[in-house]
Design a protein with these regions (language model features):
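Peripheral, non-catalytic segments that deliver or gate enzyme domains
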Residues: 1-118, 122-128
Length: 128
């Protein structure tokens, strides 16, 4: 499910009533794909993740345990000094519009930093 344009993966457990718990090891940011190994016989799954700073990674997991990476695409740059954060802009009508920022860790957000801004219009229609 998406929550403020961030993927959220939950495990549903039946204990008298349905309970929703976050999937252990699901990343905070980025794209997440999950596929059951054998949904009728096990709690095992394959998890594919990627984000602005992390190459696509395939992991194997068992519900309730940290997934184990199996294979990753190569990294094309050193992301160790960078971080992803989410912020919200307010439109003229008061709607909160989420956006992500990739910046140096600990960057002072004082309005004086050079910025490369990219936007996507949605519905497969890019900004022009």
């Amino acid at each position: 499910m998406l929550e403020d344009v961030k993927n959220r993966v939950y495990v549903m457990k039946l204990d008298g009533n349905w309970k929703r718990e976050p999937l252990v090891g699901a990343p905070e940011f980025g794209t997440v794909n999950i596929m059951a190994v054998d949904p009728d016989e096990s709690n095992e799954f394959f998890l594919t993740t990627t984000d602005y700073l992390t190459p696509t990674t395939l992991s194997y997991g068992v519900i309730g345990q940290q997934p184990k990476p199996l294979k990753s695409l190569p990294a094309f740059f050193d992301a160790s000094g960078l971080e992803i954060s989410q912020h919200f802009a307010t439109s003229k009508d008061g709607t909160k519009v989420p956006y992500f920022m990739v910046a140096k860790k600990g960057l002072e957000l004082n309005g004086a930093n050079p910025t490369l801004l990219y936007g996507y219009g949605g519905f497969e229609i890019s900004l022009q």
